[in-house]
Amino acid sequence: KPISTTYILPSNEHVDIKDIRLMFDCFKKQNINFLEILFTKYYYLNPVYADIYQKILNNAENIAHYNNYAAVNCIAGMVFEKRAALCHPYPSLIDRIEKYGYDRKQLHHIFRCEEFLNRFISGESYANCLIPTNIEFLKEVKSNPIFISLKNAIKLADESVERVKTIKQNYMDNVAIKINSEVDTLLNDTLYDIFKLSFIKELQL
């Protein structure tokens, strides 16, 4: 049975530990939060399985384009989710909400995801989409408490949501769904090879 857990560090940072089977399922759901780890330069691979897993990293773009509808739905869904959280007093956000009326980080994510969606559907590589073109603006949104007032934050967030709804609908109306079966094969074969090697090593103990 796949098992995953979350470790909470003394700094309150969260580290997700995922069973590789569940991780591959997350890749297929096309969520940016999981796919982006395929593109980072900072990672450690268990040397025992590195050669097998390298095929996954070599096919990062193909995996990130496994299902175009799932990708668009996930990116748009993140915008809607961040809008819902913008002024909501979640326990982890309540200090910011009480002080400023909204969470700047959520607004930052809304802007970032809208730009990502536009670039993704225009055909840019996933690797490029992960790097915002308006980094300085996003830094100001995220870090400067007086950069955007509460009233303007709500207005801008709502406008972004409406644009994203339109972009998503136009895409679904005019672009056919594409599912890359070769990615299914790659992920399944990689899982098989990793588990096979793991079992062989266990039997040798």
Where are these regions (language model features)?
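Metal-dependent nucleotidyltransferase catalytic core
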Residues: 1-45
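Residues in flexible loops and secondary-structure boundaries
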Residues: 35, 129, 202-203
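Conserved nucleotidyltransferase catalytic core and NTase-mimicking acidic/glycine-rich helix/loop elements
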Residues: 52-193
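Intrinsically disordered, low-complexity terminal tails
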Residues: 188, 192-205
